[in-house]
Each structure stands twice: as C-alpha cells, then as structure tokens.
C-alpha cells in the first residue's frame, strides 16, 4: 500500500527561520516523492497571524531553493501558485474550514461551547499504524474533547491539518516524531468526516550533541546559519539524509540522485539522531575538494563577492585557479574567503611574531638566495618551481622547509595557506617577485 504514487507535503509556519529539523522533514518528503515519481506539495500554515512575517516566508522559499527541493504544487515567491488544490495558504482557506466544521456540528460530532467549537473525541482505543514506528495503541478513553474553532473564529491546528490533507489528497504524512501524540486526534477527525486517514510515518527527532532536543532557540538550529557560513547545499543535503537514514552499505558521501534511487521509509531509523557539527564540516570539506571546479566556482564567486573581495571586473581565469588551490585546504566558504584574501590583495597583513620568526635578517637572506633562481624561471609552473627550490636547498645546505616557510610568509603574511608551488604558479611570476622585493628591499 505504501508503494502507491505518493502525494506528500511540507507545511511550515512563516514565523521565523527554517529549522534544521524542518529542512530534514522537507527533504525526506521530497526524496519519497521523487523516488516514487509522486508529488511534493508546499503548504503554508499561517493561521497564527500575530507571528507571521513576510520575511519568514521569503526565508522558507530561499532555503528550500538553496537545498534544491523544488515543489510540484504550492505558492511561489512571486505571489502566484501552482497546483489545482489551492489556496496553499491556510489563512486563505477559512471558508473551507468553516464548511467542515459545520458538517461536524450537523452530525453532532462537534458542539458549540462558550462560542468555541469542540470536537467530540471518541472514547476508545485508536491504533496508529506507522510506517516507521509500527503499530502504536493509544487509549483515548479518558481523552477530553478539544477545540477545533476558537471563539474568535480562528481554527486550531488539528482541524486545518486534517482538512488540508483531505482536500489536497495527501497519501502519506511524513513528519517529526513530536507530532505522533497528535495523530490519534487526526485519525478521529478523519473518521468523523467519513474518510480514511493518510499513511503516517513519524521520523526521529534531531538532538543536540548533549542529547537534548534541538529547539529553535539553539545555536546551529537555523538553515540560514549554514548558508551564511558557506556550507555547500549538496553537502548540507547529504548530511541531513544521514540524520535518521543511511545507505545499506553505511557509506556517508553520496549524491542526490543516489539518495533518490535508494530512499524509502522502512530504512529510516527509529532512534533519534544527534547533530554532529564536526561530521558536517568533514562532509562539506569532502565536497569542497571533490566537486568539479566549474560547479564549485559559482559558490566561491558568491562568497567572495559578498565579502567585498571581488567584483564583476575580477579576472575570472585567475580567480578560478586560485579557488582551485585553496579548496584543497578549507572546509567552508567562510574559510575559503579568509584563505583567498592574500591571493586577491597586494596589501598584506603581517603578524609581528611571524615576521620576527621568519622574516628577520636570516629570513631575508634566504629569500635573497631564492630570488635570482625565481627570476630565471620562464614557465613558472609548480613542478619546475618545486625542483628549483629543492635543488637550491641542496646547493646551499639548507632544508627545503627553510625556503618554503619564508616564501609563504613573505607572499601571504601567513604561516598556513595553499600548497606553496601551486600558489606561486597561480600568483604568477611578476606578482611573486614584486611581493618578495617588497619584503627584502629593492633589487640592487
């Protein structure tokens, strides 16, 4: 039965940033829809008018788009929508909810009390047949009737959730395990309306490293934080997959097409998933190094432009080469920006302690030894430069590291950075010589 062509939905509230848990819920729904060639619906639960903001709605659109989670039905950023089951904003569906509410009242399955409408909760055992958690039995014999329409005319989550799932023909409800306790009420509402409920699949919670539930107040709980840090969407999406699901062979790096091909609900773990920032960093670093440079470059261009280091007039050929050598050493876009600074600007910042250690009189002497050999190089290719420095160190009776460390500090102002010889090649002969003479003094 769970192999029917699915219609699934992601229904966030536009009241703040997109939570990591919400992003994972969206991803799992999207993967399920794509795997079975079904429909992924975006629905906006904006019934809390006092907390809704246009900015939060924009963040939902932007973050889902950044993750590559395209929706088949739902509202669009330009104010339009696509799909035949709209409106896709709950605030625009009040007449629909009133109709269903009145239907329940007419059948005496709901009643008015103190101007609010209460649903008569059946006093019986309700079974939730969950595709992940299995059969769960809820004893509702002592369950109280609950409000479905408030005295001010606004509707409570339980009714609108059920009505929208019914009207939009949702086949599978894939959501966080924290909603499991609501499910008996939802099943009771479906039965009261004479309809079969969708299939339910409650996915495990995401926990902080300490083991507590990750809440919206926790640092690192917002998708936007990872965008701002310069995480790649491919890597972040890959990591979200691992928060409750994995490939059978337990391989941790995989592309989205492989995830689509292999994703299914029975493989989702029962135990809660702990968010591991170090593993996310590792995965992002793997993607930084392994993505085709042409695929990484637009991200790098965006990060560097946002940081004010480049503009539309920047030499793209040089920039791409520089990104190509820096990406081997960094894990995030923010790190890449920091490492690119000395490559993009001739105004270098030298730490006094570093100068004393590497650019003292002895250091300058070592640089002067290297300069004539660098001046004679015609091709200025990494392999040739490496051979020259190694031969020079043998000739002068020094360690190769004596030249490497001082060249790096003289050229970047730093003790760490991209591999030296590729960096020399990318900077180019003239820029290298100019920077070295600026350190050791003008050519005699």
Swiss-Prot record:
Single GO MF descriptor: ATP binding
PROSITE patterns, per database record: AA_TRNA_LIGASE_I
Motif 'KMSKS' region: positions: 213-217
InterPro entries assigned to the protein according to its UniProt record, in alphabetical order: aa-tRNA-synth_I_cd-bd, aa-tRNA-synth_I_codon-bd_sub2, aa-tRNA-synth_I_CS, aa_tRNA-synth_I_cd-bd_sf, Glu-tRNA-ligase_bac/mito, Glu/Gln-tRNA-synth, Glu/Gln-tRNA-synth_Ib_cat-dom, GluQ/Sye
Catalytic reaction list: tRNA(Glu) + L-glutamate + ATP = L-glutamyl-tRNA(Glu) + AMP + diphosphate
Motif stretch ('HIGH' region): 12-22
Gene Ontology process terms (BP): glutamyl-tRNA aminoacylation
GO CC terms, sorted: cytosol
SUPFAM superfamilies: An anticodon-binding domain of class I aminoacyl-tRNA synthetases, Nucleotidylyl transferase
Entry's EC annotation: 6.1.1.17
Keywords, alphabetical: Aminoacyl-tRNA synthetase, ATP-binding, Cytoplasm, Ligase, Nucleotide-binding, Protein biosynthesis
Gene3D superfamilies from the UniProt entry: 1.10.10.350, HUPs (3.40.50.620)
Domain of life: Bacteria
Binding residues annotated for ATP, in chain numbering: 216
Localization in the cell: Cytoplasm
Protein task: Catalyzes the attachment of glutamate to tRNA(Glu) in a two-step reaction: glutamate is first activated by ATP to form Glu-AMP and then transferred to the acceptor end of tRNA(Glu).
Assembly behavior: Monomer.
Family listed: Belongs to the class-I aminoacyl-tRNA synthetase family. Glutamate--tRNA ligase type 1 subfamily.
Protein name: Glutamate--tRNA ligase
Gene: gltX
């Amino acid at each position: 039965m769970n192999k029917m062509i699915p219609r699934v939905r992601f229904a966030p509230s536009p009241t703040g940033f997109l939570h990591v848990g919400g992003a994972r819920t969206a991803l799992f729904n999207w993967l399920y829809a794509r795997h079975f060639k079904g429909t992924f619906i975006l629905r906006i639960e904006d019934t809390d008018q006092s907390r809704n903001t246009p900015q939060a709605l924009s963040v939902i659109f932007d973050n889902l788009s950044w993750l590559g989670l395209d929706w088949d039905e739902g509202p669009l950023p330009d104010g339009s929508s696509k799909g035949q089951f709209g409106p896709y904003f709950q605030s625009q569906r009040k007449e629909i909810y009133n109709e269903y509410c009145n239907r329940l009242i007419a059948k005496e399955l709901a009643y008015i009390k103190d101007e609010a409408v209460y649903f008569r909760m059946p006093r019986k055992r309700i079974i939730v047949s969950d595709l992940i958690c299995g059969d769960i039995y809820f004893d509702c014999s002592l369950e109280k009737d609950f409000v479905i329409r408030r005295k001010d005319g606004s509707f409570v989550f339980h009714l609108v959730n059920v009505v929208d799932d019914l009207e939009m023909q949702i086949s599978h409800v894939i959501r966080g395990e924290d909603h499991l306790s609501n499910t008996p009420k939802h099943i009771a509402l479906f039965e009261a309306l004479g309809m079969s409920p969708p299939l339910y699949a409650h996915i495990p919670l995401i926990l902080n490293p300490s083991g507590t539930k990750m809440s919206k107040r926790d640092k690192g709980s917002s998708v936007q934080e990872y965008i701002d840090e310069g995480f790649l969407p491919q890597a972040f999406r890959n990591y979200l997959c691992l928060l409750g699901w994995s490939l059978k062979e337990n391989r941790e790096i995989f592309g989205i097409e492989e995830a689509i091909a292999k994703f299914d609900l029975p493989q989702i773990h029962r135990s809660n998933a702990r968010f591991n920032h170090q593993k996310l960093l590792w995965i992002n670093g793997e993607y930084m190094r392994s993505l085709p440079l042409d695929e990484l470059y637009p991200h790098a261009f965006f990060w560097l432009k946002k940081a004010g280091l480049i503009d539309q007039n920047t030499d793209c050929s040089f920039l791409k080469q520089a990104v190509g050598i820096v990406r081997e050493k960094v894990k995030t876009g923010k790190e890449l920006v920091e490492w690119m600074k000395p490559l993009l600007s001739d105004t270098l910042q030298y730490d006094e302690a570093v100068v004393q250690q590497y650019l003292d009189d002895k250091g300058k002497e070592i640089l002067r030894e290297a300069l004539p050999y660098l001046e004679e190089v015609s091709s200025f290719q990494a392999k040739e430069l490496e051979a020259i420095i190694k031969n020079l160190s043998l000739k002068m009776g020094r360690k190769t590291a004596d030249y490497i460390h001082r060249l790096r500090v003289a050229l970047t102002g730093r003790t760490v950075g991209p591999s030296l010889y590729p960096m020399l090649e990318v900077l180019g002969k003239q820029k290298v010589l100019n920077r070295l003479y600026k350190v050791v003094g003008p050519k005699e």
